[in-house]
Amino acid sequence: MQAYESGDERGLIYGYVLNGRGGGRRVGRNQIAVLDLLPEESLWLHWDRGVPEAQAWLRDSAGLSEFACDLLLEEATRPRLLDLGAESLLVFLRGVNLNPGAEPEDMVSLRVFADARRVISLRLRPLKAVADLLEDLEAGKGPKTASEVVYYLAHYLTDRVDTLISGIADQLDAVEELVEADERASPDQHQLRTLRRRSAGLRRYLAPQRDIYSQLARYKLSWFVEDDADYWNELNNRLTRNLEELELIRERISVLQEAESRRITERMNRTMYLLGIITGFFLPMSFVTGLLGINVGGIPGADAPHGFWLACLLIGGVATFQWWVFRRLRWL
């Protein structure tokens, strides 16, 4: 488990009571059942859904429907938003995988239940975005309400996406600069395939996640803060820019790969053309030498004192004539 997420309370990673002023206090697993929230307070619980005790708490003590629990605990999810009625909703998001040995595009699922005064989030693998939110709360500059907890989580998830896509674009810039600086330089095809696969993996989850932000900007739940829509619209715009950047990255990679393919094809064509010219040049001379060397009724000119030099002169004449013909035909 990552150092930035270390829960040892039977699946509860973080428990926090928000005081409505950007800060709050931590709560342990045993305190949850006896909490008595003040009117301005909200509760945020962050769980490791891979721990059986966390799953048991969700089903037995969270007060959620079986349908909601099944969705929160299912194995395979895609980013989506579900209105559960009664002023509550489920939000399924994805974050960049920064765990050791993992591929960043293998995005980590974050499942969130939220209502007016409570947010329950679950993950299987650690997410740095959650730790960033906790740091804000510890510093007294974090979310003040349940709706802001959901927004802060989405905001920090999007920050990681921004950084990752900028890194991909920078790597591609370096490849393009290398190719432009030296016409003979070949781009690293393995690197291009990796960048293309990474871009496709990110796009798979970011496109539906952008739609979630757009939906949340239009939601009119009573516990949403008045300016929430503006913040969700900004996140929607950021993800839209990221998706456009991913599309541009894909096009740039395609251009590099097509240019390299054309370069290889042209080099092969030049090589084949050169081999064809060489073959065409020496074929008549090979015919003459083969004809002179045929051992039927004796070798022509074998008894002549200058036979060898005459044969060389004949071959030289054929070569000169061929060179003249090739030049006239612009083959050389």
From Swiss-Prot:
<comment type="similarity">
    <text>Belongs to the CorA metal ion transporter (MIT) (TC 1.A.35) family.</text>
</comment>
<comment type="function">
    <text>Transports divalent cations including Zn(2+), Cd(2+), Ni(2+) and Co(2+). The proton gradient has a small influence on transport suggesting that the transport is probably not proton-dependent.</text>
</comment>
<dbReference type="InterPro" id="IPR045863">
    <property type="entry name" value="CorA_TM1_TM2"/>
</dbReference>
<keyword id="KW-0812">Transmembrane</keyword>
<keyword id="KW-0472">Membrane</keyword>
<feature type="transmembrane region" description="Helical">
    <location>
        <begin position="308"/>
        <end position="323"/>
    </location>
</feature>
<dbReference type="Pfam" id="PF01544">
    <property type="entry name" value="CorA"/>
</dbReference>
<dbReference type="InterPro" id="IPR045861">
    <property type="entry name" value="CorA_cytoplasmic_dom"/>
</dbReference>
<keyword id="KW-0406">Ion transport</keyword>
<keyword id="KW-0171">Cobalt transport</keyword>
<feature type="transmembrane region" description="Helical">
    <location>
        <begin position="278"/>
        <end position="286"/>
    </location>
</feature>
<feature type="topological domain" description="Cytoplasmic">
    <location>
        <begin position="324"/>
        <end position="332"/>
    </location>
</feature>
<keyword id="KW-0997">Cell inner membrane</keyword>
<keyword id="KW-0104">Cadmium</keyword>
<comment type="subunit">
    <text>Homopentamer.</text>
</comment>
<keyword id="KW-0813">Transport</keyword>
<keyword id="KW-0921">Nickel transport</keyword>
<feature type="topological domain" description="Periplasmic">
    <location>
        <begin position="287"/>
        <end position="307"/>
    </location>
</feature>
<dbReference type="GO" id="GO:0046873">
    <property type="term" value="F:metal ion transmembrane transporter activity"/>
</dbReference>
<dbReference type="InterPro" id="IPR002523">
    <property type="entry name" value="MgTranspt_CorA/ZnTranspt_ZntB"/>
</dbReference>
<feature type="topological domain" description="Cytoplasmic">
    <location>
        <begin position="1"/>
        <end position="277"/>
    </location>
</feature>
<keyword id="KW-0864">Zinc transport</keyword>
<dbReference type="GO" id="GO:0015675">
    <property type="term" value="P:nickel cation transport"/>
</dbReference>
<keyword id="KW-0533">Nickel</keyword>
<dbReference type="GO" id="GO:0005886">
    <property type="term" value="C:plasma membrane"/>
</dbReference>
<keyword id="KW-1133">Transmembrane helix</keyword>
<keyword id="KW-0170">Cobalt</keyword>
<dbReference type="GO" id="GO:0006824">
    <property type="term" value="P:cobalt ion transport"/>
</dbReference>
<keyword id="KW-0862">Zinc</keyword>
<keyword id="KW-1003">Cell membrane</keyword>
<dbReference type="GO" id="GO:0006829">
    <property type="term" value="P:zinc ion transport"/>
</dbReference>
<protein>
    <recommendedName>
        <fullName>Divalent cation transporter CmaX</fullName>
    </recommendedName>
</protein>
